[in-house]
Amino acid sequence: MKISTFALGLSIEMSRIFSFSILNSHFSIKQWIMSDSIVIIPTYNEKENIENIIRVVFGLEKEFHILIIDDGSPDGTAGIVKRLQKEFPERLFMVERKGKLGLGTAYICGFKWAIEHKYDFIFEMDADFSHNPNDLPKLYAACMEQGGDVAVGSRYCNGVNVVNWPLGRVLMSYYASVYVRFVTGMKVQDTTAGFKCYRREVLETIDLDRIHFKGYA
């Protein structure tokens, strides 16, 4: 499996590793999917950011769809998304879950949804602008044009490039990446990155039902 990693602000380092091991609509899947790419954004109390980040993504020259996985945000995040769905009915989708079930399970839920709906390129991105949505086309190009199976938006290829995070969280993430690289021998600089693009075929090789998380992981 070919992994492309790049600093987005963040660079693309190339390495090759081997993988370890709804929505009701009156349209057919082929009718309403007009993009090959979907961005999964987990949310919990993101009312301050969610509309802005959706509009930025939809303002990009490359067309992306968005899937929001909302964990019952008490601040009304889901209500904002529902309002925007009226404006973007064929590009913006949401799965609402009851309770704060965790980031990891949100992505698993999103992966299953995206695979079911036949998107070719499936992205992970945070809602709080700690990932720059303007870099989504770079991730797409790394997979589509450069042949990567997975593209990682790295914060650590060229020093440390992190925004909207407290220092303690930055240090924890950085040294966690160092530890994972040391233990596994992976050549990916940012092993804890949450800004990625996967080819659908890669995720289809993984039994997502066997992946389990504890806490808000």
Q: Where would I find each of the regions flagged by the language model?
A:
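Cell-envelope/extracellular polymer assembly enzymes that use nucleotide-activated donors
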Residues: 36-38, 65
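A conserved acidic beta->alpha catalytic loop
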Residues: 70-79, 129
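Conserved donor-nucleotide/metal-binding helix-loop-beta segment in metal-dependent transferases, i.e.
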Residues: 134-154
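Conserved catalytic loops of nucleotide-sugar-dependent glycosyltransferases that act on lipid-linked
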Residues: 103-111, 130, 134, 163-217
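Short, well-formed alpha-helical segments that are part of the catalytic scaffolds
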Residues: 46-59
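Conserved donor nucleotide-binding strand/loop of the catalytic core
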Residues: 78-117
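Short beta-strand/loop segment that forms part of the nucleotide-sugar
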Residues: 63-73, 95-96, 125
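Short beta-strand-to-loop acidic/aromatic patch adjacent to the donor-nucleotide binding site
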Residues: 119-130
